[in-house]
Regions:
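A hydrophobic alpha-helical transmembrane-helix feature that marks the membrane cores
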Residues: 1-246
């Protein structure tokens, strides 16, 4: 493969995946808004005209259609399977010729899932979440560039480790209903998730900027790109929850 800087390698690997992940839900929302008036379907899904409390168009999914339920279930199962495959693949350090196709399929499925979630909740919150994501990402790039603080220090990594551990515990409690969460509890978890992965963006971007020449290889680029990918995906999911909770 061609000789490039580590940053260029990361961008080559990351940008297509993020484009797919964000492009699919944007397309789904725009297509659904058009289909609600034309009566057409999008990926087999049908929609009804509805409005939110602010009197903005809020496309409603037609839940009476059995295909809709099957679509949600099938996409959820496929997202789970390919997320596990992708995680195991990167943990084992598989080569790029296997990693890229698997991650591409994962990005496509995650994009469809996020699109379905945005349409299910309120696509207007999806737009707000997306704008917020770009603002956070822009700040996460600028801060390490112009700040003298080292975000890759052991203390900062330890703090992030504590945050992610707490987040995992809360998510397990939510998933298996070990503790009955109030609305405040759900909001706290969502904000903790958004803050944690925003800080992880800072950490991983600073890690990339501080990498030396010995780390300029495709294996390192693949790992850093994957970490940044996880940061962005998880951050968007928590932002969607925050805006959906209102």
């Amino acid at each position: 493969l061609m000789e490039t800087s580590l940053i260029a390698k990361v961008l080559i690997l990351l940008l297509p995946q993020i484009t797919i992940f964000l492009g699919v839900p944007i397309y789904m929302v725009l297509a659904a808004r058009k289909a609600v008036f034309s009566g057409e379907s999008v990926f087999g899904l049908r929609f009804r005209e509805a409005y939110n409390l602010n009197r903005k168009l809020d496309v409603a999914i037609d839940w009476d259609d059995e295909f809709t339920w099957r679509s949600f279930a099938n996409v959820y199962i496929l997202v789970f399977i390919f997320t596990i495959i992708t995680s195991v693949n990167h943990a084992l350090g598989a080569n790029l010729f296997f990693s890229i196709p698997v991650l591409t399929v994962t990005s496509l499925l995650l994009g469809i899932w996020v699109g379905l979630m945005a349409l299910w909740l309120d696509e207007n919150t999806g737009v707000s979440a997306l704008i917020t994501l770009f603002i956070i990402l822009f700040c996460a790039i600028l801060i390490p560039l112009f700040s003298e603080f080292d975000f890759t220090t052991g203390y900062f990594a330890m703090f992030l480790g504590i945050c992610i551990l707490l987040l995992i515990i809360l998510e397990i409690c939510r998933c298996f209903r070990i503790i009955e969460f109030s609305r405040t509890g759900h909001r706290f978890t969502a904000y903790l998730g958004a803050i944690t992965f925003s800080l992880y963006l800072l950490y991983d971007i600073d890690l990339l900027l501080r990498a030396d020449a010995s780390q300029n290889n495709w294996a390192t680029a693949s790992q850093i790109a994957y970490y940044l990918y996880l940061d962005i995906v998880n951050l968007l999911l928590y932002l969607l929850e925050i805006f959906a909770e209102g």
